[in-house]
């Protein structure tokens, strides 16, 4: 009987603002209680309704009867002794597993969160791509990653990176709902310039995100300069051409006045020749993407089990970078954190 009763409970973090108000109003007597409940969930990061100490016990009991507050469990935690990065393995209520990464940085801490369990894009250099897509993460499961990491580390999170497992643009409705919560002063209150959504370039979704005008940062995972090369690295690119993806990035910039990053994983012998660098520069110029709001982020390949690619040497990386710089492109080589615990770019897999 108790199990049957539990099945009627709602996961409170799955509810957007309007849904939350509709669900809670029938059991409260004073409207101000809504803001108190929101404060306990998001600001105080309470893990049980019993801890809502400024709310009457009768209301706490009603909340506990109607809602789940948390559904995820941290089943594994690995901390790098090199840079203090932490890799979390979460288990869902339906016994599926995914990952998040805490990235400390002198008080400006970020968390890299997942949007799906597994990934349908199957990037050849990425461990997540070897994991068959199980399902989208719900709004609540995406949000709970942040709350659990803050609870565990006792550190304030000021930056959010949608760069974990999955393609955020293929979980678009939940992405939008989560962005609303992240930007809401009543909930997380994180500035739009401190949120980055990474995508392989789902062109209609990029344009829709631009039209919604959240103004968050966008990172486009390009990784190649011609279609044949990209098909090898990003097998399921859903048919969008490199130029269409870059044009969608330009559209995003014009609509949001935000910042665009072009992500480019450097793989030895595949996409790191001088010709590749010159071609990338020409592509960016043709799409009018050489300006102060655009940065190319070069990511040297991080080792992944059963993937035969190799990391290029520093000389090759620096040569590629210098060609881009000579063409007026703002370029950075990412210093991957957590590589020794399989928490860096491309390493989030089972």
From Swiss-Prot:
One of its GO terms (cellular component) is cytoplasm. [4Fe-4S] cluster binds at residues 119, 123, 126. Binds 1 [4Fe-4S] cluster. The cluster is coordinated with 3 cysteines and an exchangeable S-adenosyl-L-methionine. The active site is at 345 (s-methylcysteine intermediate). Its cofactor is [4Fe-4S] cluster. Keywords: 4Fe-4S, Cytoplasm, Disulfide bond, Iron, Iron-sulfur, Metal-binding, Methyltransferase, rRNA processing, S-adenosyl-L-methionine, Transferase, tRNA processing. GO terms for molecular function: 4 iron, 4 sulfur cluster binding; metal ion binding; rRNA (adenine(2503)-C2-)-methyltransferase activity; rRNA binding; tRNA (adenine(37)-C2)-methyltransferase activity; tRNA binding. S-adenosyl-L-methionine binds at residues 166-167, 198, 221-223, 302. It holds the Pfam family RlmN_N. CDD domains: Radical_SAM (cd01335). It is an enzyme of class 2 (transferase). This is Probable dual-specificity RNA methyltransferase RlmN. It comes from Endomicrobium trichonymphae. The lineage of its organism: Bacteria, Pseudomonadati, Elusimicrobiota, Endomicrobiia, Endomicrobiales.
